[in-house]
């Protein structure tokens, strides 16, 4: 797909005004966010050129691998965590903060996110539907007990006894959707309902190429929602969007907030 990168100065002010007006008058507005929202926080994209999956084999993080070789799965997961975060401590950027501001001002009802970084929560957004889970927790595969991931990962990194285990004896795993696993029904059902009921649907920083999340803007558009796509690259949903803003999300979203 073409990569037509523009700055905020290349976006027609009338388009920004139109998006702001749509949000101002909407009864229900929803945002779907992808990796492009978090790259400005220093988190690399998983897909695309030089993405994480270009350097790490996704098969190493498949559900089958966890079942067959939990120690190897965890060793590779520690390596993946280092590749993603290294020495950085990611913080919310202007895009996360703008979405939180839209919600606080009553112009956004929920954020549906494909990201697992927890930065929408950190920015102060109250209603976040984490479609792929979150790396900030681990969950016991047997009893479902959840713990803070940072503590467990630090203990695992300092131990030769992998995988980390719950008090019940079950194996802890990242509280994310692994390859080979379906998206949680509760999260997906809520996301579909919000998309269907929305008057405005913002698709922000997502290639809209990964199902089933990529179906959400389609559901919204079919329900007569005003679809707005904010992404550097073309997406499969551009043709059905009322507005396509091909510019930096950390510039576009604050510019919309300023107009409200």
Curated annotation (Swiss-Prot):
Pfam families: SIR2. It is found in: Cytoplasm. Binds 1 zinc ion per subunit. It catalyses: N(6)-acetyl-L-lysyl-[protein] + NAD(+) + H2O = 2''-O-acetyl-ADP-D-ribose + nicotinamide + L-lysyl-[protein]. Keywords: Cytoplasm, Metal-binding, NAD, Transcription, Transcription regulation, Transferase, Zinc. The active site is at 132 (proton acceptor). It comes from the Archaea. Zn(2+) binds at residues 140, 143, 166, 168. Its EC number is 2.3.1.286. NAD(+) binds at residues 35, 39, 46-47, 114, 116-117, 132, 206-207, 231, 248-249. GO terms for molecular function: histone deacetylase activity, NAD-dependent; NAD+ binding; zinc ion binding. The keyword Cytoplasm applies. It is an enzyme of class 2 (transferase). Nicotinamide binds at residues 46, 116-117. Its cofactor is Zn(2+). Residues 9-260 form the Deacetylase sirtuin-type domain. Belongs to the sirtuin family. Class U subfamily. NAD-dependent protein deacetylase which modulates the activities of several enzymes which are inactive in their acetylated form. Deacetylates the N-terminal lysine residue of Alba, the major archaeal chromatin protein and that, in turn, increases Alba's DNA binding affinity, thereby repressing transcription. HAMAP family: Sirtuin_ClassU. PANTHER family: NAD-DEPENDENT PROTEIN DEACETYLASE, NAD-DEPENDENT PROTEIN DEACYLASE SIRTUIN-5, MITOCHONDRIAL-RELATED. This is NAD-dependent protein deacetylase. The gene is cobB.
């Amino acid at each position: 797909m073409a990569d037509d990168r523009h700055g905020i100065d290349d976006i027609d002010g009338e388009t920004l005004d139109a998006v702001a007006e749509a949000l101002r008058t909407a009864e229900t507005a929803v945002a779907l966010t992808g990796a492009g929202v978090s790259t400005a926080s220093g988190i690399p994209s998983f897909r695309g050129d030089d993405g994480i999956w270009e350097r790490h084999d996704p098969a190493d993080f498949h559900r089958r691998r966890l079942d067959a070789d939990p120690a190897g799965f965890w060793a590779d997961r520690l390596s993946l965590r280092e590749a993603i975060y290294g020495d950085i401590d990611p913080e919310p950027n202007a895009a996360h903060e703008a979405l939180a501001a839209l919600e606080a001002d009553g112009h956004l009802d929920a954020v549906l996110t494909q990201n697992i970084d927890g930065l929408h929560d950190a920015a102060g957004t109250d209603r976040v539907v984490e479609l792929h889970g979150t790396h900030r927790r681990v969950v016991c595969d047997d009893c479902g007990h959840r713990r803070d991931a940072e503590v467990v990962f630090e203990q695992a990194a300092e131990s030769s006894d992998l995988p980390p285990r719950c008090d019940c004896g079950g194996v802890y795993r990242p509280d994310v959707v692994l390859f080979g696993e379906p998206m949680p029904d509760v999260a997906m059902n809520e996301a579909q309902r919000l998309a269907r009921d929305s008057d405005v649907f913002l698709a922000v920083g997502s290639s809209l190429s990964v199902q089933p999340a990529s179906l959400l803007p389609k559901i919204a558009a079919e329900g007569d929602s005003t679809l707005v796509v904010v992404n550097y690259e073309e997406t499969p949903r551009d043709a059905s969007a009322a507005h396509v803003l091909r510019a930096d999300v950390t510039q576009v979203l604050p510019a919309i907030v300023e107009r409200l």
